[in-house]
Structures are given as C-alpha cells and as structure tokens.
Curated annotation (Swiss-Prot):
Disulfide pairings: C32-C44, C33-C42, C38-C45
Transmembrane segments: none
Domains (record comment): The cysteine framework is III (CC-C-C-CC).
Gene Ontology CC: extracellular region
Keyword line: Disulfide bond, Secreted, Toxin
Family named by the database record: Belongs to the conotoxin M superfamily.
Top-level taxonomy: Eukaryota, Metazoa, Spiralia, Lophotrochozoa, Mollusca
Name recorded for this polypeptide: Conotoxin reg3.12
The keyword Glycoprotein belongs to this UniProt entry's keyword annotation: no
Natural source organism: Conus regius
Length: 45
C-alpha cells in the first residue's frame, strides 16, 4: 500500500501556481493567520 507516494507523484505534475496555492492553503489550516491577513482559510479567526 503506497497511497502517500501515489498522491505525492500526482502533485509533482501540477501547475506550479496551483501547487503553491495548495501549500499556502495547507499552511493556513495548520496555524493562525496574522490579523491583517485573516480570511476564511484561517482556522483561528
């Protein structure tokens, strides 16, 4: 079973802009956003 590797391989072929947006979105979910940058993607706002 290698689902993680399969998904990682799929992401390598994404458009760099889309991949960057996915990383930014994941970071927003992990931690609080700064007050001036807060939007619906932040969990602690």
């Amino acid at each position: 079973d290698q689902p993680v590797e399969r998904h990682a391989g799929n992401k390598r072929h994404l458009n760099p802009t889309i991949r960057r947006a996915m990383i930014i979105d994941a970071n927003r979910r992990e931690k609080c956003c700064e007050v001036g940058w807060c939007d619906s993607g932040c969990e602690c706002c």
